[in-house]
Amino acid sequence: MMPSPSDSSRSLTSRPSTRGLTHLRLHRPWLQALLTLGLAQVLLGILVITFSMVASSVTTTESIKRSCPSWAGFSLAFSGLVGIVSWKRPFTLVISFFSLLSVLCVMLSMAGSVLSCKNAQLARDFRECSMEGKVCVCCPPIPLHRPCPEWGQELKVALNSTCDEARGALKNLLFSVCGLTICAAIICTLSAIVCCVQIFSLDLVHMQLAPERSVSGPLGPLACTSSPPAPLLHTMLDLEEFVPPVPPPPYYPPEYTCSSETDAQSITYNGSMDSPVPLYPTDCPPSYEAVMGLRRDSQATLFDPQLHDGSCVCERVASIVDVSMDSGSLVLSAIGDLPGGSSPSEDSCLLELQGSVRSVDYVLFRSIQRSRAGYCLSLDCGLRGPFEDSPLPRRPPRAARSYSCSAPEAPPPLGAPTAARSCHRLEGWPPWVGPCFPELRRRVPRGGSRSAAPPPARAPARRFSDSSGSLTPPGHRPPHRTPPPPLLLPRSHSDPGITTSSDIADFRDLYTKVLEEEAASVSSADTGLCSEACLFRLARCPSPKLLRARSAEKRRPVPTFQKVPLPSGPTPAHSLGDLKGSWPGRGLVTRFLQLSRRSPDPTGTGAHGYKQVRRSPWGRPGRESLHLRSCGDLSSGSSLRRLLSARRLEHGIRPHSLSLNGGSRETGL
């Protein structure tokens, strides 16, 4: 049963720590009973006081004046006021005090009633009255004819009209006081009973609602065994009152202020975060192309104004390489062609193709978002660079490959437009830090003549990552021309650069040949490590030995290359792996690349006609190098599996090789 608003307005919140201030949630009848009893006591007290004072003023006898119970009337009035307060504030302490005063008033009322009744009987018996001056002296009837008894026992009443009327008025007043005191005693008794029942009910409620107090006592759970309350107590107390719980605090979604990730994201999208803007993890950022507006010559670097070239005209034929995250590593999953108006997702690889590979722009959103390195993605569509255009025409290649983002599937035949180099600049490092360019080793016929398109089965091209750079064979010198400023070619994946066999060697011929063979191969665990490599600047580029090659079930020695000393010193981090501890898997990959199962030929030319060719007809005197470095975190699951497969290669377990047009080949790291 729910309490009414008036009941709740009369009750205060209880304080468990203060037992005396605990209020009783009583029903309206019980509260009205307390109010009625208090008012009755106040009224009876006032009447007793009034009649007692009038009676004492009528008579001049000292015994009657002292027996008038005016003191009982004062106690009744005070007890009644406490009762009214207990109705207004039903605290346990107030109710207990009211019950105590009620018991005291009962005793005082009984004493006052006895005294008042005795004096009333005396006034009724003294019928023999005589006038002495202005006072009527009344004496009890005595059969003997003599005057009143001894002095002091007579009743003296103030003269009114007659002595009988004065005596009768005194008698009536005393009987009235006697009756009032008796009624006051009854009212005080009821008040004391009601208060005791309320206090007892409060104790019973405490025992029922807090049974754990008895369990924690010295006698254990047998200290108190309470029974269900009686129906009377249920009707008296509201035990089912609903107390609404405290409402929970308002919920606000977490706000992520500017951090390292948001800094990198602002760098990526060429935006500035002046104030901490709330970023929620469920909100996907816009696509790179939608923000940057990659159209024609706007695809140059974001932070290097030197790379902006007005002659860069790139027609947009987008090809998207979907990238999936495998425990922090980037794994190329699928390749598809989209129309010119399509926009790739944030983790896609954008290839700009028109007839030939003109521009490549690969957005590594995950890596850029998690690093604070100030690298940028740029695109150089100019035809000038390490690779010159060849007069040999070719047909436009079709954008598809298995591991890399910029690999044509089939070799371009004659009659097609020339291919320009693909530029993917991540950071413009100083020219004195030698970049590491990978190289391509081809087997050239001993006759020295080179054909326009070497047969794939007879001369399978191989790719690997040479951290020291490609060595220029003796006798091959670049033509005398003014070398342009070094244009570094960091790449999005582990597709190595291709070098020509001579000054007039055609790079595109070799490059498209390798891409044809790579398109026919299947990604395996031994080549997965190279397929996720990305190009960054390193302070050191150690020169690993060239891996062996096997073709037509024959093993051939691989020449050893000389190491090129590079400037040493601490290098800032350029990827997530560097930030996580200077890339702990770098040492494992370097050790694996430096291992060789057979000693290479120190002369640089093997028994089967391998020849090392130069990368570019110009550049720095000496050698140019392009270092391949993994974009993904090698501590992830897929990278660990690739390291384990690399361990198996190191212990002699060679992977299967695929044949293309009758030729057997193996992809080496």
Swiss-Prot record:
GO cellular component terms attached to this protein's record: membrane
MF-aspect GO terms: WW domain binding
Encoding gene, per UniProt annotation: Entrep3
Modified residue annotations for Phosphoserine: S359, S390, S494, S575
Family per record: Belongs to the ENTREP family.
Residue ranges crossing the lipid bilayer per the database entry: 34-54, 67-87, 91-111, 174-194
Glycan-linked positions: N160
Protein name: Protein ENTREP3
Biased composition (Low complexity): 399-408
Assembly mode: May interact with WWOX.
Disordered: region residues: 387-420, 445-502, 550-571, 597-624
Keywords per UniProt: Glycoprotein, Membrane, Phosphoprotein, Transmembrane, Transmembrane helix
Membrane topology: Multi-pass membrane protein
Location relative to the cell: Membrane
